[in-house]
Amino acid sequence: MHTTFEKEGIQQSAKDFFESENDNPSASLSLSFCVQTLDGTVILSGILENTPVTLTNIKPWDISEPNLYKIVCTLSENGTAIQTETITTGFRTTRFDTNEGFFLNDAHIKLKGVCQHHDLGALGSAVNRSAIKRQLLILKSMGVNAVRTTHNMPAAMLLELADEMGILIVDEAFDMWEMSKTTYDYARFFKEWSARDVKSWICRDRNHPCVILWSIGNEIYDTHANEHGLEITRYLKEQVLLHDPYGHALPTIGSNFMQGENARKCADILKIAGYNYAERLYNKQHADHPDWVIYGSETSSTVQSRGIYHFPLAKSLLTDNDGQCSSLGNSTVNWGAKNQQFCAVSDLHMPFSLGQFLWSGFDYIGEPTPYQSRNSFFGQIDTAGFPKDAYYFYQSVWTDAKTNPMIHILPYWDFNPGQIIDVRVYTNAPKAALFFNDTLIGEKKLAHTQEDNIIADWSLPYKKGVLTAIAYDEFGNEIARDTKHSFCDASSLRLSADRLEVPANGEELIFVTIDALDADGYPVDNANNRVHVTVEGEGLLAGLDNGDSTDYEPYKGDCRRLFSGKLLAIIAPTLNAGTITVTASSDGLKDAVLTLNTVACKNRDSDDLHIMTITRDPLADAVSHATDIPVRSITLSCEDSCILTANKPSTVISAVTHPANAAAQPLDWKVTNAEGVVVPYATLERIDDTHMHILAFADGSFFVRCSVTNGRGYTVLYSMLEFKAEQIGTMNLDPYSFTVGSLYSDSEGEIANGNAHGAATGSEGTTSITYGPFDFGLFGSDTVTIPIFETESRPVDLTFIEGKTKTQPGTVLCRGHYDKKMIWDTYQEETFKLPKRLTGVTTFTIQVTNRKLHIGGLSFKKLEKAWSPLSVTDIDRVYGDAFCKTDDAITGIGNNVTIEYTDMDFGERTCVVIEITGRSPIEKNTIHVRASNGTNETLNIAEFTYSDDYVTKRFPVNVLSGSQTVTLLFLPGSNFDLKGIRFVKI
């Protein structure tokens, strides 16, 4: 409620809570009320008039003390009760200050929020109170105090729980208005249904003290496209205020178009503006619009897979061969924050901002950027409810070390011997220290308001042992510690539940975590064993979820693989009191058994109870009896040094798979860069199944990767070892093979990770992406094909530059025009004709201004000299007694002139046609056409008759197969002007 507090108590009108309709104006109606605590203690009761009622001894609703009350109102006609309504609500004040941010009950609060989709992982979109509560508890432990319900009206249970748990809510309604985002979305119904839907939405939710803002839309293109968006904004604002006239919450919008004038006009109507991924605009637009309240309605969009680490940390990596995203903190999409540190700290330095809402709290089903997989990677928590490393990062920023000290190490500790591992420590303490086997590695003082000093980072070579991180307070006292042990193969399973006893009401759920331990009892953090789960007694298995976005096995089955060492089993009790026995088993491991209890419900009304319906996915039968033992990890080692030189350019690398009894399968070997893109600096030669010979033939750093599919048909895990080649020499790229977008040699301006190993340009300013150097050869190419993913379905121009380096600006070749309707997350090829052929060794630069584009890569069409039009500039050698060479012709060709074209490869053809474009001022020029490969030759005669202008004439000739030199010989008596030649297949 947006209420007014007074020293004596709280003034509140019944109209704030209820609406009534009087169909009989002549009847004697009265409205009585009773305000009571949740345990039934009456605070005040009486008859309501049209004057405010003052409540005394009321405890306000707050995020730290979410005090709630019941209000019972009874409408009576002539003394007879005809309707009774009961609500649970709370009393609080809110204030949105344009300079100081958000105040709850006059206390400043920075919104530490997340965006949440509606699904519940393995439960899908089915609403369950205990599942939602579990999500909110996990979020609160992270430090979250606010949730944005993206992008639809939330389940009533969510708001009820937010009231009870003290979580602020931005209650959002629409993801589109009249302009659709997909074919069958709500835009089809907006004009007819929006008024009715707003009424039901506001009237249902307006008495929840947790709700502080009504969001009327998310990333609405109508607000950007034209001024009709302003009309809809006014209309929706009016509809909200019509049903919430007392301003219990205020209307707002979440926009990714705030750089545009039209969207700013819409924001000016609302005065509370949510920005999606636009922190760069805050300060200027705060200065330009001092009457606006500003906040980050959607931020972050870093992507991460729990327990997956793509090294090195210094390399920004979006996609990789395993279909996962790195949890090191180096995996970001091009529209989101550059890293977690920026996202967390930038908002802190803008006191006028209400706060921010990370995208997202939990992973959710669908929208799986940057891959076409099962669910998203954006969450700080996976779909199973297991925190990712990013969770602990935000916990380190959003929680207080004095009340909830914490520290967290990443990654797990199981890699190749000697491999350089980036180790990160997150803590909310002012100082952290890292130890390896009790030896101090280093200490770091941290400042949680400084982007570059918020994480403690170290790099060290891997060897077996234990990492320990210790957090210290400002006085040097230890307040928290975390450890990561090296581990061996899984030996047993372990079960743990969020609670061991629940009421037998058919609605409560128990969430059981299954993980694997080695023989010494240490967690096997990369375990992927297949686990079978059975539930006996008064319970049912409602679902299994491991949080793996790439795992398509059914949720509604009885077996799944562990992912990064964990699996969640969701248990649904029946209506009967008793015990539930949960058993987890895996081939070769000790079973784990857990006993749970269900207790009879007191005062149980069977009409109010129902048992959860559990439906088994038919696809689950395909895997229910599987007993495969997958490869957990691959250990790579080099027989001597990983530094290759001109004197020793090769070595042998070996692989050992774990566990030893894993299913036999081929190992896939590649030479790649850090992103997993194949690079041409070295080659691999197979010795046997587990040994490869590597030979380097160019300087540079590269990785040998060894991967397995574990029966899934795609890479599921890999191991890599870094090599450096020195003093061998440099090499140029092949322009006629596809060069992946991320393999650029230089860049200027804003650049980010593109989809599928591409490169993404910035939306503001000019971005230049340089590739090469390429060796185009003597004849070269004048055609380039570029796969492009353009996100707005608007035309865009690209500028192409030759020869740009760090010291040379290069030469502008031309501008290319791209205009194709966007297909989401899909590259579409466009071929561009260049005004000249690129030859020799040079670079190629793509330049884009003020547009976000994904460049998937590029490849050039190799022109076949033998079959291409050859102008006088393509002549390799000309000599003789008389001729005059200009830019476009050789004129006055006279006695004993020889014109040579080298590297003419006709393949297997020996009979062709030569087209000669020239001018013969005499009756006839006899041109001798000779083809020679140094061993054999052919000689042909072309009689070019009189012409007063340039004409093209065709002559059949014999040539040799393969590569050769073609010569035009002009004997004494010749008088000819030549513009060019061309050979044609017959």
What are these regions (language model features)?
Residues 1-151, 161, 165-166, 197, ...:
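Secreted/periplasmic carbohydrate-active enzymes, especially glycoside hydrolases
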Residues 1-22, 396-418, 629-646, 771-776, ...:
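Extracellular ectodomain segments of secreted/surface proteins
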Residues 11, 361-364, 674-677:
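Exposed regions on extracellular, virion, or secretory-pathway luminal proteins
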Residues 60-63, 138, 205, 264, ...:
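A general structural signal for stabilizing positions within well-ordered secondary structure
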Residues 80-478:
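Extended substrate-binding grooves/exosites of carbohydrate-active enzymes
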Residues 90-92, 398-400, 484-489, 599, ...:
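Flexible, low-complexity linkers/stalks enriched in Thr/Pro that connect modular domains
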Residues 431, 532, 585, 605, ...:
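Extracytoplasmic
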